Amino acid sequence: MPSPKRTFLDRELAHLVKHAYANAPAVKRIFDDAGVKPTEIKRVADLARVPVTPKDRLIQMQRESPPFGGFLAADPQRLKHIYLSPGPLFEPQGADRALDQVAAEIFRIAGFKRGEIALNTLSYHLSPGGWLLEGGLQRAGVCVVPGGVGNTELQVRTRSE
């Protein structure tokens, strides 16, 4: 019998696949070209049947159909951020902050405590790294000083004060 966590993951995955197929033209095209129906993806184990899109192909698709290559399965007006990661790849971020919760749990396990102050030196420039750390730290109750990269002497002085 599957664990409650596995049952939850399977159910969420099946929902996500059906949603992406119905709302993201590129996902529908990839599934159809491979002869895979979204209803066939019911469990995490079924992911092996999902066609993989290589990074080079994804970049090409984003150039042909900017900015997301037909992979956006949400209303563009509901996006919170658009990141540009190395590749270059455009990455949308909606209002869902599930990654913040995951990052917060990791920070708690690492020993961060509510009320502490953290200097975030990851870049906030176009990539999601700085924002992901900030969201997780804030969710864990930590106050964030958004340092980013550069200004090393000022950041060292800020840290020591």
Residue ranges and their predicted role:
Residues I109-V144:
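Conserved AMP-binding loop of ANL adenylate-forming enzymes
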Residues A74-Q77, A98-V102, H125-G129, G147-N151:
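Short secondary-structure boundary/capping elements
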Residues P66-L72, G111, G130, G141, ...:
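Glycine-centered flexibility motif
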